[in-house]
């Protein structure tokens, strides 16, 4: 008697600086999870991103991400990039996730703007072997399938939320509130730890 093969886990990997994580990140991850029927979405805060000079301490960004994702049972947070020394590259993130989930089908979730720059990323040829790529777009974005850098990239339109981490940091620095832009627990964490120069 033969037994049916266990289906492969379908895991989304959402890397980002998350400085701070905001509701736009969460909505995008939730939409991708639902649309692609992912078993899990792993949020991976970057350690030292190669394209940014200054970021908030990794432990703060990791803890804010844990707080933000805690209510969704399909969301988890990984420390692989935070705990790895040196500059963070997507290829290293995916290699580490592949080592811990050798049989899973991985889907790397990123923005449409980033996907158009992917050919300049480190070890780009291996990226396609490690994961499928999902480019999240907003209504009105003009990226089309013909503009994608590789056949294994799928476009997924998500609701438009005009929120950016840069704007959230600037608002806090000017003493403006970020309620409803970032999750409540993250607002409180930012205030408690006096992040972004000014308490809320």
Curated annotation (Swiss-Prot):
Q: In which pathway does it act?
A: Cofactor biosynthesis; NAD(+) biosynthesis; deamido-NAD(+) from nicotinate D-ribonucleotide: step 1/1
> Which reaction(s) are listed as its catalytic activity?
nicotinate beta-D-ribonucleotide + ATP + H(+) = deamido-NAD(+) + diphosphate
Which domain of life does the protein's organism represent? Answer: Bacteria
Under CDD domains, the record lists: NMNAT
What EC number(s) is this enzyme filed under?
2.7.7.18
Annotated GO biological process: NAD biosynthetic process
- MF term (GO), any: ATP binding
Keywords (alphabetical) are:
ATP-binding, NAD, Nucleotide-binding, Nucleotidyltransferase, Pyridine nucleotide biosynthesis, Transferase
Summarize the protein's role. Catalyzes the reversible adenylation of nicotinate mononucleotide (NaMN) to nicotinic acid adenine dinucleotide (NaAD).
Regarding protein family, the annotation reads:
Belongs to the NadD family.
Q: What name does this protein carry?
A: Probable nicotinate-nucleotide adenylyltransferase
The species this protein belongs to is Clavibacter sepedonicus (Clavibacter michiganensis subsp. sepedonicus)
Lineage, opening ranks: Bacteria, Bacillati, Actinomycetota, Actinomycetes, Micrococcales
């Amino acid at each position: 008697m033969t037994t049916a093969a266990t289906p492969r886990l379908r895991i989304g990997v959402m890397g980002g600086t998350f400085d701070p994580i905001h509701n736009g990140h969460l909505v995008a991850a939730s939409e991708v999870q639902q649309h692609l029927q992912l078993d899990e979405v792993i949020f991976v805060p970057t350690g030292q991103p190669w394209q940014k000079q200054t970021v908030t301490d990794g432990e703060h960004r990791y803890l804010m991400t844990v707080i933000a994702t805690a209510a969704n049972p399909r969301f988890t947070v990984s420390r692989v990039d935070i705990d790895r020394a040196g500059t963070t590259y997507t290829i290293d993130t995916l290699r580490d996730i592949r080592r811990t989930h050798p049989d899973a089908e991985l889907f790397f979730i990123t923005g449409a703007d980033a996907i158009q720059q992917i050919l300049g990323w480190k070890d780009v040829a291996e990226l396609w072997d490690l994961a499928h790529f999902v480019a999240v777009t907003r209504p009105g974005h003009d990226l089309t399938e013909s503009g994608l850098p590789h056949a294994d990239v799928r476009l997924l339109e998500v609701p438009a939320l005009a929120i950016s981490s840069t704007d959230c940091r600037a608002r806090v620095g000017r003493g403006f509130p970020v309620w409803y832009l970032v999750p409540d627990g993250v607002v409180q964490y930012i205030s408690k730890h006096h992040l972004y120069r000014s308490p809320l």
